[in-house]
Amino acid sequence: MSGDVIVTVTLNAALHVAYATGKAADDITPISRPGYRAGGRGVTVARLLHSFGHDVLAAGLAGGASGELIIQDLARSGVPTAFTLIRGESRRFFRFSDPDPGGPALRFSEPGPYITTEELGRFAADYRRLLAGAAAVVLCGSLPDGLPADTYGSLVTYAAEAGVPVILDAGGEELRHAVGHAPDLVVAESNAADAGTGGSGAALIRLGAAAAAIAAGGQVHAVTADGEWTARLEPADAAGPDPVCALARGALVAGLVPGQLLGWSWPDRLRHALALAAGGAGPWTRAPGEADERDGVDLAAYERLLDAVRVEPPARG
């Protein structure tokens, strides 16, 4: 690597397994062959950045047959990987679609693997080697069982020592322990920021983050050294998913990364990120067998939504 690669880290990567169901007969519901897709917010970030032509490397932890399928799916998408292999089985999410159009889908989530101290040590060594060629690191998502709550804090510190900027997407205890290590940008939901730090984006800045982007209620509020901005869609129903939801959070983070690296103005960063997130990119947006296999962005929707994003300083009371 030559110092221009964006490294994404997904420590709790998931394999999304989707089934289409048929009409039940004699208490038996037929299902389709499964569709597999690599998931986890860091994986989504890597996939979307790759779609926009950025050099990316998806790293993290992966194990078992599910881990192999995660790596294979990313390879089919053209996304390079450098996962540290573990003995446990990577978690799986299951989705069973309703046979009636517009009907509800059933979703199930496994708890995921337990990570040993030895496995964490191997990952840390791999991660520090990857930093030598990284333009930025994106740390995303929950931590699997076995990892200490300050794991992200250590990874932020390693990156800072290597001179590599860090974008952190986390919440709760993981965020609370990491923010004092001074990540360059924190992305969080409003409730995750409250749970992790007892406050807002401004609280994250006081605790050590250089900048913070907080998603809530279809809006994104950014607090930075250069000022504060709020981005929203007008009209509010210009697109479906709320950028807070799990499907769109990875897209929101991916939308903020290029501007962080290239020094865009914050209004431009937020416009790009919210338009991308509002498209609802995520592993559940396609059922098995659907035609769109571009593994990325609906560019027409993205360009249309750019014009629907309004960015303004927050109203002063």
Residue ranges and their predicted role:
Residues D55-A58, D226-W229, E234, G259-L274:
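Phosphate-handling active-site elements
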Residues D184-L185, S200-A239:
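Conserved phosphate-donor
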Residues S2, D268-G317:
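Charged C-terminal helix
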